[in-house]
UniProtKB/Swiss-Prot annotation:
Membrane topology: Single-pass membrane protein
Species of the source: Acidianus bottle-shaped virus (isolate Italy/Pozzuoli)
Residues annotated as transmembrane: 28-45
Keywords assigned by UniProt, alphabetized: Host membrane, Membrane, Transmembrane, Transmembrane helix
Protein name, as recorded: Uncharacterized protein ORF53a
GO cellular component: host cell membrane; membrane
Subcellular location: Host membrane
Length: 53
């Protein structure tokens, strides 16, 4: 599964939760940024480890 797909799924889940009033807008934004940051860090780490081999 692609990590970009993972971020898209995360954004979709956040939108659903927002419309159900389970998350505030601020919480949804923070959660999305956290997932995006983790995905970016993973890609960065993966690229660095493949370059060093």
């Amino acid at each position: 599964m692609s990590l970009l797909l993972l971020t898209d799924v995360d954004l979709l889940i956040n939108l659903i939760l927002l419309f159900q009033k389970k998350l505030s807008l601020k919480e949804a934004i923070v959660f999305s940024l956290a997932v995006f940051g983790i995905v970016e860090a993973y890609y960065y780490w993966k690229n660095r480890s493949s370059e060093s081999e």
